């Protein structure tokens, strides 16, 4: 394992050797045919191009971030929400017109009856 120190890397990388191919398997420069359209004024020379996916003989692997740290157990800091019963007071007004059994016309205002009801809403 080789240590790679580079001024552009924020922390050092360790290089692990990968699968190494024999020289016969490594692709060399290959000659590509001229693919320029016929509209070109000048004849283009044959171009040399490298294989688009060169094989790397090693992989750069970043070091583990928690190498020197001890294991810290994870603690759930989010408290579970418990439902709290909050009593609410609602005022219900019943307006009832009471009629007597007599034949007289009652011109008084209807009676107002106020009941206070307490309900629990969850």
Curated annotation (Swiss-Prot):
Location of region: Disordered: 102-122
Keyword Repeat: no
Lineage, uppermost ranks: Eukaryota, Metazoa, Chordata, Craniata, Vertebrata
Assigned GO CC terms: extracellular space
Described purpose of this protein according to its UniProt entry: Kappa-casein stabilizes micelle formation, preventing casein precipitation in milk.
Pfam families cross-referenced by the UniProt entry: Casein_kappa
Glycosylation sites: 84, 86, 89, 95, 102, 118
Residue(s) carrying Phosphothreonine: 98
SS bond list: none
Chief localization: secreted
Gene Ontology annotations of biological process type: lactation; protein stabilization
Modified residues (Phosphoserine): 102, 119
Similarity section: Belongs to the kappa-casein family.
Domain of life: Eukaryota
Distribution of this protein across tissues and organs: Mammary gland specific. Secreted in milk.
Subcellular location: Secreted
Keywords assigned: Glycoprotein, Milk protein, Phosphoprotein, Secreted
Marked site positions, Cleavage: 58-59
Name of the protein in question: Kappa-casein
This protein's record includes keyword Coiled coil: no
């Amino acid at each position: 394992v080789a240590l790679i120190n580079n001024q552009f890397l924020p922390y050092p990388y360790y290089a692990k050797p990968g699968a190494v191919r024999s020289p016969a398997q490594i692709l060399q420069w290959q000659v590509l045919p001229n693919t320029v359209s016929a509209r070109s004024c000048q004849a283009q020379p044959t171009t040399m191009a490298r294989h688009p996916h060169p094989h790397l003989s090693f992989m750069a692997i970043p070091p583990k971030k928690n190498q020197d740290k001890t294991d810290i157990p994870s603690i759930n800091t989010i408290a579970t929400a418990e439902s709290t019963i909050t009593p609410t007071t609602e005022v219900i007004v019943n307006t009832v017109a009471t009629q007597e059994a007599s034949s007289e016309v009652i011109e008084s205002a209807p009676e107002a009856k106020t009941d206070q009801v307490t309900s629990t809403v969850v």
